[in-house]
């Protein structure tokens, strides 16, 4: 009779708590006598707090075995056994580790901004390399021009020293003079012949 009455009382209390489920959280505790007699069930209700790390006063003194596995920032379920009774508790962990990991990733992705010293060193290196290239090009051009000038001088110095060049020029000039004299003599002969023919014709008339 004692157990039947206790069960009926439990069902009545559970029905009442279903209507007030939004304002209170039921926790069931079971007590057993050490002498092996019949145990009675008792229900206690405690208000639910909005704090995620809130632990009821009835559960504060009981040992709990929390599992070490779980995702950061989410609830970690843990189960414990005390005096033959099983219970499940739900504990929330603040998401500090996730925020720290995100901040570390953002810091790693941010590239260091170039400073004025690095910009100046890069600019100086570019100017120096440009000047060196210009100097090399000027040296090459000066060498090419000097080589051409030397080649021209050597050719001019070799031309007057060639054997037979003066004789050829003199022979060409004498040949030209002889041609001119021959043409003059032939013209004189033609004129003289024409004069003689005209005189003979006049005499005949």
Swiss-Prot record:
Keywords: Angiogenesis, Apoptosis, Cell membrane, Chemotaxis, Cytoplasm, Developmental protein, Differentiation, Glycoprotein, Membrane, Phosphoprotein, Signal, Transmembrane, Transmembrane helix. Residues 25-124 are extracellular. It comes from the Eukaryota. It is a single-pass type I membrane protein. The modification Phosphoserine is found at residue 198. Residues 49-101, 153-175 are annotated as: Disordered. Residues 49-71, 86-101, 163-175 have a biased composition (Polar residues). May be heavily O-glycosylated. InterPro entries: ECSCR. GO terms for biological process: angiogenesis; apoptotic process; cell differentiation; chemotaxis; negative regulation of angiogenesis; positive regulation of endothelial cell apoptotic process; positive regulation of proteasomal protein catabolic process. Residues 1-24 form the signal peptide. The chain crosses the membrane at residues 125-145. Highest expression in endothelial cells. Also detected in vascular smooth muscle, macrophages, lymphocytes, and mast cells. One of its GO terms (cellular component) is plasma membrane. It is found in: Cell membrane; Cytoplasm. Residues 146-205 are cytoplasmic. Regulates endothelial chemotaxis and tube formation. Has a role in angiogenesis and apoptosis via modulation of the actin cytoskeleton and facilitation of proteasomal degradation of the apoptosis inhibitors BIRC3/IAP1 and BIRC2/IAP2. Belongs to the ECSCR family. Interacts with FLNA. Interacts with the 20S proteasome subunit PSMA7. This is Endothelial cell-specific chemotaxis regulator. It comes from Homo sapiens (Human).
């Amino acid at each position: 009779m004692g157990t039947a009455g206790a069960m009926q009382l439990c069902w009545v209390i559970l029905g009442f708590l279903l209507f007030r489920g939004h304002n209170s959280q039921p926790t069931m505790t079971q007590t057993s006598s050490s002498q092996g007699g019949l145990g009675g069930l008792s229900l206690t209700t405690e208000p639910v707090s909005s704090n995620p790390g809130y632990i009821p006063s009835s559960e504060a003194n009981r040992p709990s075995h929390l599992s070490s596995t779980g995702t950061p920032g989410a609830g970690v379920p843990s189960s414990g056994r005390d005096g033959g009774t099983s219970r499940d508790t739900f504990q929330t962990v603040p998401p500090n580790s996730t925020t720290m990991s995100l901040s570390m990733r953002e810091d790693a992705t941010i590239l260091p901004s170039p400073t004025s010293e690095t910009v100046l060193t890069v600019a100086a290196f570019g100017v120096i390399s440009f000047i060196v290239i210009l100097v090399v090009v000027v040296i090459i051009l000066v060498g090419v021009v000097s080589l051409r000038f030397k080649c021209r001088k050597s050719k001019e110095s070799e031309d007057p020293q060639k054997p037979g060049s003066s004789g050829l020029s003199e022979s060409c000039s004498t040949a030209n003079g002889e041609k001119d004299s021959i043409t003059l003599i032939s013209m004189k002969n033609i004129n003289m012949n024409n004069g003689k023919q005209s005189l003979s014709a006049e005499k005949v008339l």
